[in-house]
């Protein structure tokens, strides 16, 4: 017998959950990837993708086909699916979808700010922005000279507004400060999303909290790695770490003091979930990077999310799995396009 919470979930969200599970069943299989890597050119790739759930999504594209066009059209297709889910959702699932879009909005804001710093035309940068992170005021981002300007003139009416509380300053938006701003926004965003899922409770919390804990810790590791050899102080580095992961508090304190990859690895060695990931990183050419092993772990967690029912995590997991699939296709397409077939199998299979 279903309990009342599960019955309510089915009544409000059961249709969409069934739909997203159907979409997940349409992800590319290992057999599909074997066929893709055997393609001689991008037209062959297009023909094979037509036999999958991607269908004729490239039918209206002029030849010769480019990797950029394939990437753009895949994003548009994902966006159409996501918007269908969101437009047919009820609260609190609608708010969950809004949280999902915030990460793309942050990336778009940073992309536009970097474009403005390099004096690139706004329309050229807008083309590169992710459609899931679109908001009305995006074109005005290039007028901001400080984080305070950015908030007051542009973002005050967007879902990003709450995440700017700890980010407003009068510092000039140079390359380093823009990257610091990105990480502060992500810290506030992940912590808020984690709190929302935890407060929601039930299976959604049981599935999403570990996923977001991993995402928080991954960001802490990557921030640390990217800060080596930069002007960022250890104290400032620590303020950028999200505090909702397994590393909090002691692991983050130790990570802030790390001065090289080996010291980072020693911190990871104290955590059962992260030790094998760092051990899988290879120094050799063509070996796995830290980013690779994090992506692999993310795929595993998102696949496992579908083993549970009656929760919002399937929507997050499907979107992340679809993004990994898109990265795989772009990687294979780039290798085909550039005739660099030696690394064509360095993708991350999902099913």
Swiss-Prot record:
Record keyword RNA-binding present: no
InterPro entries membership: ATPase_csu/dsu_sf, ATPase_V0-cplx_csu/dsu, ATPase_V0-cplx_dsu, V-type_ATPase_csu/dsu, V-type_ATPase_csu/dsu_dom_3
Molecular function as annotated in GO: proton-transporting ATPase activity, rotational mechanism
Annotated GO biological process: vacuolar acidification; vacuolar transport
Encoding gene per record: ATP6V0D2
Originating organism: Bos taurus
Stated name of the protein: V-type proton ATPase subunit d 2
Described function: Subunit of the V0 complex of vacuolar(H+)-ATPase (V-ATPase), a multisubunit enzyme composed of a peripheral complex (V1) that hydrolyzes ATP and a membrane integral complex (V0) that translocates protons. V-ATPase is responsible for acidifying and maintaining the pH of intracellular compartments and in some cell types, is targeted to the plasma membrane, where it is responsible for acidifying the extracellular environment. May play a role in coupling of proton transport and ATP hydrolysis. Regulator of osteoclast fusion and bone formation.
Disulfide bonds: none
Pfam families: vATP-synt_AC39 (PF01992)
Gene3D superfamilies per UniProt: ATP synthase (C/AC39) subunit, domain 3 (1.10.132.50), V-type ATP synthase subunit C domain (1.20.1690.10)
Range of residues in the leader sequence: none
Subunit-structure text: V-ATPase is a heteromultimeric enzyme made up of two complexes: the ATP-hydrolytic V1 complex and the proton translocation V0 complex. The V1 complex consists of three catalytic AB heterodimers that form a heterohexamer, three peripheral stalks each consisting of EG heterodimers, one central rotor including subunits D and F, and the regulatory subunits C and H. The proton translocation complex V0 consists of the proton transport subunit a, a ring of proteolipid subunits c9c'', rotary subunit d, subunits e and f, and the accessory subunits ATP6AP1/Ac45 and ATP6AP2/PRR.
Record family assignment: Belongs to the V-ATPase V0D/AC39 subunit family.
Keyword Transport: yes
SUPFAM superfamilies, alphabetized: V-type ATP synthase subunit C
GO cellular component terms, A-Z: apical plasma membrane; early endosome; plasma membrane proton-transporting V-type ATPase complex; proton-transporting V-type ATPase, V0 domain; vacuolar proton-transporting V-type ATPase complex
UniProt entry keywords in alphabetical sequence: Hydrogen ion transport, Ion transport, Transport
